[in-house]
Every structure is written in structure tokens, then in C-alpha cells.
Amino acid sequence: MPTINQLVRKGRHSKTTKSKSPALNYSYNSMKKEQVFNPAPQMRGVATRVGTMTPKKPNSALRKYARVRLSNLTEVTAYIPGEGHNLQEHSVVLIRGGRVKDLPGVRYHIVRGALDTAGVDGRKQARSKYGAKKG
């Protein structure tokens, strides 16, 4: 336990929390050719690779993912939610934060129904999460 004099001299430091989606915290200034701190809720990117991945130990599946080069020039791995998708290389996608617990290294989700990503066909419930139209 610090003495009062030590607290007067140094003070207490508050803990800094690390971002769970660091790629969304920076944008790219092409004039200065540097990344600028500018947090955003979503970000646009181009899919450089689309494939499947197997989840961690107790689960078994082929989870769909895309490697995306964002507009701030960072490359991230993003999960494609829902059943079936129309994504391929060079598709323009919208990325949001949110990890997939059983896929290591996947910290982002692709927003369905935005830009080149189509919504899920025949979806009746939770339609807004999958970009599905009514009817």
C-alpha cells in the first residue's frame, strides 16, 4: 500500500483497455501516407480470399470466412454469417466488430445485405441480422 507522499508524487494510473477490434480504430490518410486514429463502427473492404475453416476442439463444422483488405490498408479475417453466401474474391464487403468464439483469429463479422453481400434467402426470423427482405 502506498504512502500519501508516494500518491502525491506519482498518483494512480487508470488501466488502459485494449480494443477488441483494433482494425476499426484507424483510417488511412493517403496524402500523408500514414494511419490516423479515427474509430469507426464499420469499415469497407475488398475480399482477397474466401474459404472455410474448422472450429476449435469441442465443435465440428466448416465455418465460412473471408480475408478482407480494409480501406485503411489492414488485412483482417472476417466471418460470413448465415446459410450460404455469394461472396468471391474482389467482392466489396462491409465489416463490423464481433469475434467468433470457436474460430481463432476471427475478430470481425461481414454485414449481410450491405454492398456486394446478399442477404440470406428464405430467412423468416432475425431477418435484420442477416439482411433478409420480408416475404
Swiss-Prot record:
SUPFAM superfamilies for the chain: Nucleic acid-binding proteins (SSF50249)
Keyword tRNA-binding: yes
Biased composition (Basic residues): 9-18
Region entry Disordered, spans: 1-24
This protein's record includes keyword RNA-binding: yes
A GO biological process held by the record: translation
Molecular function (Gene Ontology), one example: structural constituent of ribosome
Source domain of life: Bacteria
GO CC entries: small ribosomal subunit
Family annotation (Pfam families): Ribosom_S12_S23
Record keywords: Methylation, Ribonucleoprotein, Ribosomal protein, RNA-binding, rRNA-binding, tRNA-binding
Gene3D superfamilies the UniProt entry points to: Nucleic acid-binding proteins (2.40.50.140)
Sites of 3-methylthioaspartic acid modification: 102
Subunit architecture: Part of the 30S ribosomal subunit. Contacts proteins S8 and S17. May interact with IF1 in the 30S initiation complex.
Family from the record: Belongs to the universal ribosomal protein uS12 family.
Functional note: With S4 and S5 plays an important role in translational accuracy. Interacts with and stabilizes bases of the 16S rRNA that are involved in tRNA selection in the A site and with the mRNA backbone. Located at the interface of the 30S and 50S subunits, it traverses the body of the 30S subunit contacting proteins on the other side and probably holding the rRNA structure together. The combined cluster of proteins S8, S12 and S17 appears to hold together the shoulder and platform of the 30S subunit.
The protein, known as: Small ribosomal subunit protein uS12
Record organism: Lactobacillus delbrueckii subsp. bulgaricus (strain ATCC 11842 / DSM 20081 / BCRC 10696 / JCM 1002 / NBRC 13953 / NCIMB 11778 / NCTC 12712 / WDCM 00102 / Lb 14)
Gene responsible for this protein: rpsL
